[in-house]
Amino acid sequence: MNRIEQQFKKSPAYVAYLTAGDGGLERSLESLLALAKGGVNILEVGVPFSDPVADGPVIQEASIRALAQGTTLHDVLTLITSFRQHSEIPIILFTYFNPLLAAGDKIYQQMKSAGVDGCLVVDLPVEEAAPHLTACKTAKIAPILLISPSTTQERLKKINEHGEGMLYYVCRPGTTGVRATLPENFPAKMNQIKSMTSLPIVTGFGIANRKMAAQALQYADGFVIGSLFVKAIAEGISKNALTRLAQSLNPHYPNLRLITPFRKKTF
């Protein structure tokens, strides 16, 4: 049983995403530790990529900045290795397929050695993922697979067969980014999916406040907040304020005044 599975046995998942290398690797390490201190219990560490088609403007711009500073996949693994000196909470590598392909076959064992627990390849459909799935399982890394509102029952069966650790439900079409509410069809879709899988389901793409997170947890086993944290980091939020922001978004944390870290609204 890996750390992802252990986490779901303890409590619902509060998942936070950040783009590695945005602001420098030292800043990324500081931010990961601040999020963990703020109650996040699974971290998604994004590998910067030049064509992040699944991401909205906030994360696209973070990738551009990280790449401009020379951040590579191997730098991201070094970051995770450093984080592992301080924390054992689960880490999912969030990446596009090209960086893995360019790194070669040894990258999966290097990921495992760095302390990666799961790998989510956002642009790799399950129908084309056999080599990746095999490499993950050989290295004892959970392949985290995506499902969406348009996923058919037949395809969901295949995803359920090959996924491990959890499934990631993209609750709306389009790209990542902050939204005001969950989609109206969210409860029905979640109930349909949960009737077909025993894997925990986390949901993301748009969750940006405590109320939405609480609503998500009525049906899902966890929620993901990404763009809000990426934007806060880009705006220069301090590590202590980032911890308080993470706490203020957690439905299971004592009610806090929502921290507003932005100098201006750009959503």
Curated annotation (Swiss-Prot):
Kindly identify the residues recorded as the active site.
E44 (proton acceptor), D55 (proton acceptor)
Q: Tell me the gene name.
A: trpA
| Alphabetical UniProt keywords | Amino-acid biosynthesis, Aromatic amino acid biosynthesis, Lyase, Tryptophan biosynthesis
Q: In which pathway does it act?
A: Amino-acid biosynthesis; L-tryptophan biosynthesis; L-tryptophan from chorismate: step 5/5
User: Cellular component terms, GO, for this chain's entry?
Assistant: cytosol
CDD domains in the cross-refs: Tryptophan_synthase_alpha (cd04724)
Give the PROSITE patterns listed for this entry.
TRP_SYNTHASE_ALPHA
Q: What is this protein called?
A: Tryptophan synthase alpha chain
Query: Biological process (GO) annotations?
Result: L-tryptophan biosynthetic process
Query: In which organism is this protein found?
Result: Coxiella burnetii (strain RSA 493 / Nine Mile phase I)
Q: Which family does it belong to?
A: Belongs to the TrpA family.
Q: Does the keyword RNA-binding apply?
A: no
UniProt entry tagged with the keyword tRNA processing: no
Q: Which Pfam families match?
A: Trp_syntA
Highest taxon of the lineage = Bacteria
Protein task: The alpha subunit is responsible for the aldol cleavage of indoleglycerol phosphate to indole and glyceraldehyde 3-phosphate.
- Return the broad EC class: lyase
Oligomeric state and interaction partners are given as: Tetramer of two alpha and two beta chains.
Give the EC number(s) listed in the UniProt record: 4.2.1.20
The reactions it catalyses are:
(1S,2R)-1-C-(indol-3-yl)glycerol 3-phosphate + L-serine = D-glyceraldehyde 3-phosphate + L-tryptophan + H2O
